[in-house]
């Protein structure tokens, strides 16, 4: 029996890594991408100002955990700000596995501009945010969706944000959020209804998932402590991974296909009682 193949961006840590391991456990082989191939590498991840301190997690560590679950794993270094590397990763996955059954656009731009006020954010930063959060996912859809359509099945799942659909409670530097990042995620949300109507009855499912507040390595590195995270009732990455797997696999998930955004913590509670 052929194993399905999932293509996951931002799989070196957090939700991406948890989803990779969960899908491996349920019989998927994996093409996983991120900037960080090995532990200890340095990449930009500061939302307010530049921060290149190494973060825990890497493609190699995710692959080790997924292989322990029986998966074949292809690690592909890719930066969503470098669209050539994004295209090369998709081509590499297709060349290696011959197919992709699930595209999980999980990676998002990490860098200055995400949390700036409108009068402070630079246009070059907005360019980066939209390249990483909109253009890169669309490029992957253009690369990987045709094969799903030809087979008559598959799934495209985008990770979005509550900031794209809710008003900020305060300015970006006072506990709220800025304009550029939420608007890019709003664009990503609007991608899915377009795909649904363009490919109705194709056998391919399209979902946008809002993970809730997930306390990630990036947040920790940028100064958000565990006490604040606890106050926001943080969602474990593994719970989001459970939801991603269910949406991609279960026929009952099609009951949610019309919804603009799936709120992962709420759906997880209904499905798994936690």
Task: Spell out what each predicted region is.
Residues 12-13, 36:
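Conserved glycine-rich cofactor-binding loop
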Residues 26-61:
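Conserved glycine-rich Rossmann-like NAD(P)H-binding loop of the short-chain dehydrogenase/reductase
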Residues 48, 52-60, 110-127, 168-173, ...:
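Conserved mid-core segment of classical short-chain dehydrogenase/reductases
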Residues 53-57, 77-89, 123:
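The beta1-alpha1 cofactor-binding region of Rossmann-like NAD(H)/NADP(H)-dependent oxidoreductases
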Residues 109-110, 120-124, 155-201, 213:
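Catalytic loop of short-chain dehydrogenase/reductase
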Residues 141-142, 193:
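A short, exposed helix-loop element centered on a Lys and neighboring polar residues
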Residues 201, 208, 224-274:
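C-terminal helical subdomain
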């Amino acid at each position: 029996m052929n194993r399905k193949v999932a293509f996951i961006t931002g799989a070196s840590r957090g939700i991406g890594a948890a989803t990779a391991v969960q899908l491996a456990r349920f019989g998927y082989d994996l093409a996983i991408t991120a900037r960080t191939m090995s532990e200890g590498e340095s990449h930009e991840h500061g939302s307010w100002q530049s921060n290149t301190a190494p973060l825990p997690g890497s493609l190699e560590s995710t692959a080790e955990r997924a292989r322990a679950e029986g998966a074949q794993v292809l690690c592909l270094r890719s930066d969503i700000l470098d669209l050539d590397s994004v295209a090369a990763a998709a081509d590499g996955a297709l060349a290696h596995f011959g197919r992709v059954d699930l595209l999980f656009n999980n990676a998002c731009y990490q860098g200055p501009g995400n949390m700036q006020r409108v009068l402070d954010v630079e246009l070059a930063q907005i360019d980066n945010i939209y390249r990483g959060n909109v253009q890169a996912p669309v490029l992957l859809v253009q690369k990987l969706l045709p094969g799903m359509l030809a087979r008559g099945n598959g799934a495209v799942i985008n990770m979005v944000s509550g900031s794209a659909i809710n008003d900020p409670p305060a300015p970006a530097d006072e506990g709220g959020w800025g304009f550029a990042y939420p608007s890019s995620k709003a664009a990503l949300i609007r991608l899915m209804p377009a795909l649904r109507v363009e490919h109705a009855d194709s056998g391919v499912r399209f979902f946008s998932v809002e993970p809730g507040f997930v306390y990630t390595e990036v947040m920790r590195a940028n100064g958000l402590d565990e006490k604040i995270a606890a106050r926001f009732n943080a969602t474990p990455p593994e719970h989001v991974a459970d939801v991603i797997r269910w949406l991609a696999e279960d026929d009952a998930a099609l009951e949610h296909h019309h919804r603009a955004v799936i709120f992962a913590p709420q759906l997880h509670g209904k499905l798994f009682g936690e």
